[in-house]
């Protein structure tokens, strides 16, 4: 919801020739097709594409190839300066009036704000979109107030029930659950797992 909402406003404001660097793009991002046709978006960096947007891009909708990267690869692109973020629009379930935010309080809980934290650290401007303003200080904060330039209250940032759509999903498969448990055990026992870990 956040990407579509932001891009609709940006298009109405007349911006063109933008690079979109969204973590992943799925069925719900079909409205981006029209923004690409209108020249609002001309380049895309993402970890995955699905649905009508992917179909149209596969047919040559974009003049430039989409830059597909891993999750860790995106962090490297941003931190190395290869991918410069002029404005990061970060959808969070809740924050306080100064922008202190995490991903696990509020109605639209989304989990870790790992990508958003990297964007907040490296973007020239950070716009926080939230559906719930909580009392100051909202903590623990994954993104802190000194990283946020503007806060916009919106009706809805996303649908927590659909956070597992696309490539991410819940499983009941015993083998997959064993792999997940083993991975969690490695993280917990790595020596890096502590309060505030993301």
Named regions from a protein language model:
Residues 1-198:
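Conserved alpha/beta enzyme-core scaffold
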């Amino acid at each position: 919801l956040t990407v579509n909402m932001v891009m609709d406003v940006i298009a109405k404001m007349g911006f063109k020739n933008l690079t979109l660097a969204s973590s992943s793009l799925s069925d719900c991002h079909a409205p981006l097709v029209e923004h690409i046709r209108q020249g609002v978006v001309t380049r895309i960096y993402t970890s995955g594409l699905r649905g009508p947007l992917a179909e149209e891009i596969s047919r040559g909708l974009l003049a430039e190839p989409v830059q597909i990267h891993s999750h860790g690869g995106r962090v490297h692109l941003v931190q190395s300066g290869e991918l410069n973020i002029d404005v990061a629009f970060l959808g969070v379930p809740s924050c306080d009036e100064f922008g202190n935010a995490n991903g696990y309080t509020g109605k639209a809980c989304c989990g870790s704000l790992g990508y958003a934290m990297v964007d907040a650290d490296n973007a020239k401007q950070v716009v926080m979109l939230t559906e719930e303003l909580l009392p100051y200080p909202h903590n623990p904060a994954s993104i802190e107030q000194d990283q946020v330039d503007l806060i916009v209250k919106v009706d809805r940032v996303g649908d927590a029930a659909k956070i597992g759509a696309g490539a991410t999903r819940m499983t009941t498969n015993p083998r997959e659950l064993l792999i997940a448990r083993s991975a969690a055990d490695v993280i917990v026992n790595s020596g890096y797992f502590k309060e505030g870990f993301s």
